[in-house]
Amino acid sequence: MTRSSLFEELAEIAKERIMIIDGAMGTMIQREYMEEEDFRGEILKDHDKPLKGNNDLLSITRPDIIYKIHKLYLEAGADFVETNTFSGTTIAQADYRCEHLVHEINYQSALVARRACDDVGAATGRRRYVCGAIGPTNRTLSISPSVEKPDFRNVTFQELVKAYGDQARSLIQGGVDVLLVETVFDSANAKAALFAIRTLFEDEGVPEMPVFLSGTIVDMSGRTLSGQTGEAFLVSTKQGKPMAVGLNCALGAKDMRQFVDNMSKWSDSFIICYPNAGLPNALGGYDETPEEMADVLREFARDGLVNIIGGCCGTTPDHINAMYKAVQGITPRVPPQDPHAGKMLLSGLEPSIVGPETNFVNIGERCNVAGSRRFCNLIKNENYDTAIDVARVQVDSGAQILDVNMDDGLLDGPYAMSKFLRLISSEPDVAKIPVCIDSSDFDVIIAGLESTQGKCVVNSISLKEGEEKFKERARIIKRYGAAVVVMAFDEQGQAAETDPKFEICERSYRILTEEVGFNPNDIIFDANILTIATGMEEHSNYGMYFIEAARMIRENLPGAHVSGGVSNISFSFRGMEAIREAMHSVFLFYAIKAGMDMGIVNAGALPVYEDIDKPLLQLLEDLLFNRDPEATEKLLVAAQEMKKDGKKADTKTDEWRSLTVEERLKFALVKGVDQFVVADTEEARQNTAKYPRPLNVIERPLMDGMAVVGELFGAGKMFLPQVIKSARVMKKAVAHLLPFMEIERQANIETMGLAEDESPYQGTVVIATVKGDVHDIGKNIVSVVLGCNNFKVVDLGVMTPCENIIKAAIEEKADFIGLSGLITPSLDEMVYVAKEMNRVGLNIPLLIGGATTSKTHTAVKISPRYPHPVVHCLDASKSVVVCSSLSDMSVRDAFLQDLNEDYEDVRQEHYASLKDRRFTDLNKTREKKFKIDWDKFTAVKPSFVGRREYQNFDLNELIPYIDWKPFFDVWQLRGKYPNRSYPKIFDDADVGAEAKKVFDDAQTWLKKLIDEKILVANAVVSFLPAASEGDDMHVYDPETGNKLDTFYGLRQQSGREHDQPHFCLSDFIKPLKNGVPDDYLGLFACTAGLGAEEYCKTLEKNHDDYASIMVKALADRLAEAYAEYLHKEVRTTLWGYSTNEDLTESDLLSIKYQGIRPACGYPSQPDHTEKRTLWKLLEAEKNGIGLTEHLAMLPAASVSGLYFANPQSEYFAVGKIDQDQVIDYAARKNVPKEEVERWLSPILGYDTD
């Protein structure tokens, strides 16, 4: 492969001065006012399609015009002109049926530009250069043109490679100096173009010439149309070896600056920047003047951001001339030496850096058909939606790279790999991280590489089939731009011992770096982690062999990385999860020290090395390093003596009572022991030599203890129930000190005339559940955790009007406001509070939390209404991080910058999704409704019609129906697979012990609540004749037959495959038969929360938050259990359509019964206003169950809904709906469209602002 001398020539000029590229070709063509015949010319005079607008044809039909435009730009000062070939591929020309002219278009365009450059160069004595313009085409590899089929693509990678190759070849034949791949909105398309160009250089003998690459950031999110950040775009395309990289189009110069700045820091190439002349005006024109644009780009130049500047849409020779003059004498940017030297760069939608300072990189392992039976079954059954959820869980659990393997004999591997990767590309929360394409079939690897826009890892290749095959595959991987995993495997087989492992890796490294030209930082060696303790002596050193091989690789093969499957080491102890997890921790401790920097491991299940019991640690290290031939047997014995979570049972002791008072207070706080805290606090207070003031006791020993609690919770070494118990201890101590502090305050007022204005807290947080919402368990937990972390919390309770929140914030001089809500109407109330905070002039941060909230809603709907920090807090620990970061002036600015950038990304992604989302027309969805053959259906008549009440129900009967998993979720105790559900959670290595403690507490409290009749459970059930009409369900008076009311339905409108029905609840109710209803609908409401609120207030007055949260959580579980019990009674007795049902409690919780009970305001009918009809028909208030103005149920521990008996009825989610359905729904309900939009805002598929 020969190399053009232009590299050195252009590099020298770009180091001396800022170079200029031309402006818009299309803008100048429009000024010529050409007609259809200009585009046809003689060659296309009889063409069967209109051609006006196909500007590339003008290089053939009107070359005089194109030459004139080139010359004007060159005379204005341009160093480079672009050929008139933006749409010069067979793919783009297919729209005009001009594919047959592609070679001529490109060849003639290059000749015209070449002649203009040569003519002006000769006249001015300054050489000019031709850039062969290669546009993005009108198709994209990363985005489906069909919303209904997100895996569909209307072009393949290889089709693009051929089209780009043909174009580049013709441009080169016409005499271009540079190939410019521009306006890249999808990095996958750019990768195809670069692949084609590298193929020309490396396989066809075309001399290598400079390549420029310019992406397009579509808006202020800083992302391309396909979702990548500018930095990720650079990483994805680095294999193309661009001499210059940068941005053009979409944005004006001012808006483009921050993104050019980022690229300038990231890239060691020259930086090119040619923005639009501002943003389009209402008429599609561009208003930024040459002087305005030149002034901005002059600042780019002065700040050392650019090497080449020019213009895109709306720019003219006058703009280029102004730029040329503006940068005269300014020293160009000096490209940095490789800013990421010694690091591996990968990318998904975002860049990922693996280097010396990077923590161990966790590779998610569950998207592997060979390693996960569940994932394999999902793929075989074409259940890709759920398979994507598996990937999402991996990312949410901390995977930094997603391993995907489709190697199964019953699968079409290339098809499955392509489909899965294409699907996850439309899931930003998954696609943000890089993919590891894992297969032993190279065709599957190629399919994967051609289905993702990021820089991937290929897993794997080896010397197993010899050097030639190894080099062939390595060169292909390199051309695609991926990193590679190399197995320690050669022609003789898999290496087990240290020296063979290293020898194979060293040989592979030499071939890759010296013969293939691989970047050593893109090489990952899997040095084979093999199982120890198998009973075979030759296996006993396998752990040491790997660790020593890792050390040798990192010390002797610069840049290379070491990876492996960690769980292999402990396979002989399968079934003993606590032992396995501890063994993984010990193995990684030493392997990472030796140089292993990435691997497949369940990081969430690793105990901290220092926390492993010393006797166990000794046994594990003896086993790992083969120091004791009986280590395996000893470990098996130890396992029998251990608790299932791998830790020795605690022994009770009162030795701590002999410690100093400070140590006793700390112990009480950390352990949650309140028995002696008042006495110990008083002892500390009386030591006035050490603590002159009561406040000093809070500031020092008590806060010191809570600091330990906060640290342990943040590190995952304490769990939420323990933290809440600690808070209870703290509150009791502070309550004891408050009267003494008040006496001191009054004394100060009398002697000094004023009270001291001081606080021991980090800050003050006013927190409330918003108006209309009664749910507060999550809010209460946040209050406790914030209090444990030295924040003063002013809790305003539930159903708090906006004016009360703002008033409290002003009176308390709050540093933060926190809003909580569970039901969707609360989202609108939060928007209103934000607006009011802005109106009254507050400038403190606003925290948003609760089950119905999301980062997207916060960023899109709330944040724009309040020009100060607005932060979505996912859970209690997140709120601490947010408040602490915003309180610490040393990190506040950086935190806010990251937050603002993140929320801007979220906003832009949201608006982009609205543009791209496609909906089925409402009438067509009704044609595709779920159809039941009503002629063959006979409804079962209930045992009674009308209304029936159930008062003061025996709670003991509900205990078997309790679903305990949500209970543990309240306490943020989440087991890891396979110990997620109850009772398996008790076996979880991390949370099992604490879950058992909380569960035992719950049993004690359940008994107390029932025995003392603290809680009361009531319910009301009704069965009414019913008939469907379209999407609605009418209910009738059982005596008169008159229509009583209507339940209105919403129908699925998006996300359905062509053969899938579009569900609506009315599909499960029979229409009128001969004008008479011939079916039934059930209605119910139940509660187990009567009495809970009053009792919890008493507990909170006694500073017992733990008990208060426990009571509310149990009331909630009992209410759900009551709903489950009632539904069983309905099925088997009250309605009696399933009299022979014989299901276990587990079957009930798994919904294995006939019929459904959807709730208003939830997925099958997301409209909360339907509760008004339900309440009117049930007269639920008579049973003590009410509705707030925002339609939350009161008490909070209440459940309501409808009963459907049809055997074909099933749960479904309506999902997003379009405006046509909203208009239709509003008309049917006879309410304003705006009111419907307010209540249905979370499911609207369009923006109402």
Swiss-Prot record:
Q: Which reaction does it catalyse?
A: (6S)-5-methyl-5,6,7,8-tetrahydrofolate + L-homocysteine = (6S)-5,6,7,8-tetrahydrofolate + L-methionine
Any one GO BP annotation for this protein: tetrahydrofolate metabolic process
Name the cofactor(s).
Answer: methylcob(III)alamin; Zn(2+)
Q: What is its EC number?
A: 2.1.1.13
- Keyword set for this entry? Amino-acid biosynthesis, Cobalamin, Cobalt, Metal-binding, Methionine biosynthesis, Methyltransferase, Repeat, S-adenosyl-L-methionine, Transferase, Zinc
The entry's free-text remark on domains says: Modular enzyme with four functionally distinct domains. The isolated Hcy-binding domain catalyzes methyl transfer from free methylcobalamin to homocysteine. The Hcy-binding domain in association with the pterin-binding domain catalyzes the methylation of cob(I)alamin by methyltetrahydrofolate and the methylation of homocysteine. The B12-binding domain binds the cofactor. The AdoMet activation domain binds S-adenosyl-L-methionine. Under aerobic conditions cob(I)alamin can be converted to inactive cob(II)alamin.
Cited function: Catalyzes the transfer of a methyl group from methyl-cobalamin to homocysteine, yielding enzyme-bound cob(I)alamin and methionine. Subsequently, remethylates the cofactor using methyltetrahydrofolate.
- Detail which positions bind S-adenosyl-L-methionine: D963, R1157, Y1211, F1212
Name the record gives this protein: Probable methionine synthase
Specify the AdoMet activation domain's residue ranges: 913-1249
The root-end lineage is: Eukaryota, Metazoa, Ecdysozoa, Nematoda, Chromadorea
Additional free-text comment from the UniProt record: L-homocysteine is bound via the zinc atom.
Instruction: Indicate the segments forming the B12-binding N-terminal domain, all copies.
Output: 652-749
